[in-house]
Structures are given as structure tokens and as C-alpha cells.
């Protein structure tokens, strides 16, 4: 006779779920409500329904900024995931000394977000910067869109590469050494060991990294705004910058509608990721 599953453990999560609903659910409902109104002041609020969402969805600027955000996210993942795995492999070869490498990887994660772009802008200043010599090579992040993208991608990679490396290292360190030794006896190459032994056993950690970095890269704001304020010629004008400008312009109704659409985009990506992950899980 089958026994009913014991779900009493969910009671332990109840306080955290209530707190999450309070600090996350209520503000989200407030934003959705604001997005359905035209707000001038606290006393002048008019119902507009889905008008703001329709205007945004019919705007060419919205789709252009969405395309730039998705492109940046794809580039960030394409650069940071392989580099993070490579860094983790290097740390794994250091054995006990890997702890110092992990500390170095974690340092950028504790630097305040608003200080990171300022730090890098200072290093590429032609007169006093550590890498100021790149200006002599024709590098101009202020007026060249490709150069601006390179700076933003470099800054974001420096900031978050440590997270990818640490999680990938945790996955690689959990692989039994006996598997690698058996592969070495069989004459397997380093790539074969990684492809058939290590990679299948770190897919869980990589899935978490992929999801976190995908969502984080879509939220990029500080780097793009500080480095070139969305320029040149709106080349780095991401969704977050559009939202920030509407908030600064006191267009709270439009900003709330844009934030709601932004939330739906991220939620769709997370949902698609969860569905894809479940399909890859072996069935019992």
C-alpha cells in the first residue's frame, strides 16, 4: 500500500514564503496597478487600462532596446561561461592552493556596482590610466559603438566571472578522482575527460550559473549608464535604461507598465529554462 508523502517539511518554509510574498509580491502588485493608470500626482490618478502596454509594444524603440538587451545577454553568456569553466579547471589543477584563487575570484563580487564602471573608466583614461595606451591604438569608447560594447562586456565579465568560476569549480571538485584516473589509464585526452566525465556531472551547477547570469545580464544598467549613458547614438540603450529614463521623467504609469513587461520577459525566459531542464532530466 502506497503511503502518502510527508509534506510537513513545507511548514518549515512557510515563514520564508510569507516574507517573500510580503517583500516581493506586494511591490509587484503595486507596480502592475500603477501600470494600469496615468499618474500625475498622488491625487491625480486616471485609469488607462492596457494603453501604456499597447503603446510600448507598438514602439520601435522598445523592440530595438529589447534586441540589444538580448544580444548583450547572449554575448555575456558566450564569453563568461567558457571562461569560467576554464578558470575552474585551472584552479582545480592547483589542488590545495586553489583556495587563494577562489578568494581572488570572489573579490570583484563584493565591489559596489556603481564603483566598477568608474574603476575601469579610470584605468583606460589616456593620461593617467593603467591601460591608457589603448587610446593610441584608435580605441574610443565614447564615439565608437563597437568599442563601447567591448568596454561594457569587459566590465561585466570582470564583475561576474568569479561567480561562474566558483560554481563551476564546486561542480568539478565533486567529480570522483577515480573517474579521471580510469580515463587516463585508457588514454583519454583532456577534452574527452571533460566532455564525457566532467561536463555531465556539472550540468546542474552550470544550469544555475546560466540562469543567474542570464537574468543578471538582462538587468544591466549601472555599467551602460556610467560608461556612455546608452550611447553613442543609442547603441547601448538597453531596456533598463529606457525604464530609468521614464522614472526620472516622472512618467510613473509608463515606467510601471514597462517594468511589468520587463518582468514578463524575464519570467518567460525562466519558465523556458525550467521546461528545458526538466526535459533533459532522465526519467525513472
Identify the residue ranges that each predicted region occupies.
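A structural signal for multi-pass alpha-helical bundles of membrane permease subunits
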Residues: 5-284
Amino acid at each position: 500500500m502506497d503511503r502518502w508523502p510527508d509534506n510537513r517539511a513545507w511548514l518549515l518554509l512557510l515563514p520564508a514564503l510569507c516574507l517573500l510574498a510580503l517583500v516581493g509580491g506586494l511591490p509587484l502588485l503595486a507596480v502592475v496597478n500603477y501600470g494600469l493608470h496615468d499618474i500625475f500626482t498622488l491625487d491625480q490618478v486616471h485609469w488607462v487600462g492596457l494603453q501604456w502596454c499597447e503603446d510600448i509594444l507598438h514602439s520601435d524603440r522598445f523592440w530595438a532596446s529589447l534586441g540589444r538587451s538580448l544580444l548583450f545577454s547572449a554575448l555575456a553568456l558566450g564569453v563568461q561561461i567558457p571562461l569560467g569553466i576554464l578558470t575552474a579547471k585551472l584552479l582545480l589543477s592547483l589542488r590545495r592552493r586553489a583556495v587563494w584563487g577562489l578568494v581572488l575570484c570572489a573579490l570583484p563580487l563584493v565591489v559596489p556596482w556603481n564603483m566598477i564602471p568608474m574603476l575601469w573608466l579610470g584605468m583606460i583614461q589616456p593620461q593617467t590610466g593603467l591601460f591608457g595606451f589603448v587610446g593610441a591604438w584608435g580605441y574610443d569608447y565614447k564615439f565608437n559603438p563597437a568599442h563601447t560594447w567591448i568596454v561594457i562586456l569587459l566590465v561585466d565579465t570582470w564583475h561576474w566571472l568569479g561567480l561562474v568560476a566558483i560554481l563551476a569549480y564546486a561542480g568539478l571538485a565533486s567529480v570522483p578522482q577515480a573517474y579521471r584516473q580510469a580515463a587516463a589509464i585508457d588514454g583519454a585526452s583532456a577534452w574527452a575527460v571533460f566532455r564525457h566525465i566532467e561536463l555531465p556531472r556539472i550540468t546542474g551547477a552550470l544550469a544555475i550559473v546560466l540562469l543567474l547570469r542570464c537574468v543578471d545580464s538582462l538587468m544591466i544598467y549601472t555599467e551602460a549608464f556610467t560608461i556612455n549613458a546608452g550611447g553613442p547614438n543609442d547603441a547601448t540603450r538597453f531596456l533598463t535604461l529606457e525604464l530609468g529614463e521614464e522614472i526620472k521623467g516622472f512618467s510613473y504609469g509608463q515606467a510601471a507598465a514597462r517594468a511589468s513587461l520587463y518582468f514578463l520577459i524575464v519570467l518567460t525566459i525562466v519558465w523556458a529554462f525550467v521546461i528545458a531542464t526538466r526535459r533533459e532530466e532522465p526519467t525513472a
